[in-house]
């Protein structure tokens, strides 16, 4: 019976793991077993953080919009409510970009939002007229 030589495949696998662990500190870049454990852990981190990046950017956009809106004298919540009442559908990414790069355009949007908030009917008063509570 012919002997199965696996050294070529094993060496190739070890080389690829150690190449992936290049730049890690200490034993994790030199010893195969430690490198393999760390590379697998790193892949898990990368998978998780690719999803986390989306929520991090959303948080950043909200912070930027809120800061710019407060400089105009309105909170983030009221600003978005005013935009919704004015039927302006801009996503948070675009609003944050405008807040940072085009402050004049952003303040015009804040003005539109404030006007629509002034002209909007009060939901609490409307609920009282109907005889129902707006809070459940």
Curated annotation (Swiss-Prot):
GO terms for molecular function: rRNA binding; structural constituent of ribosome. This is Large ribosomal subunit protein bL20. Binds directly to 23S ribosomal RNA and is necessary for the in vitro assembly process of the 50S ribosomal subunit. It is not involved in the protein synthesizing functions of that subunit. Pfam families: Ribosomal_L20. GO terms for biological process: ribosomal large subunit assembly; translation. HAMAP family: Ribosomal_bL20. One of its GO terms (cellular component) is ribosome. NCBIfam families: rplT_bact. The keyword RNA-binding applies. Keywords: Ribonucleoprotein, Ribosomal protein, RNA-binding, rRNA-binding. PANTHER family: 39S RIBOSOMAL PROTEIN L20. Belongs to the bacterial ribosomal protein bL20 family.
């Amino acid at each position: 019976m012919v002997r199965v030589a696996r050294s070529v495949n094993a060496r190739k696998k070890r080389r690829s793991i150690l190449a992936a662990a290049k730049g890690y500190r200490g034993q994790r870049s030199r010893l195969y077993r430690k490198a393999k454990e760390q590379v697998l852990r790193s892949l898990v981190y990368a998978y998780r953080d690719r999803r986390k990046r989306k929520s991090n950017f959303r948080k950043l956009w909200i912070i930027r919009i809120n800061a710019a809106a407060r400089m105009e004298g309105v909170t983030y919540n009221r600003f978005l409510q005013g935009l919704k009442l004015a039927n302006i559908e801009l996503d948070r990414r675009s609003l944050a970009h405008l807040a940072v790069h085009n402050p004049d355009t952003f303040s015009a949007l804040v003005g539109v939002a404030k006007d629509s908030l002034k002209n909007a009917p009060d939901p609490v008063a409307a609920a009282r007229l109907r005889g129902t509570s707006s809070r459940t």
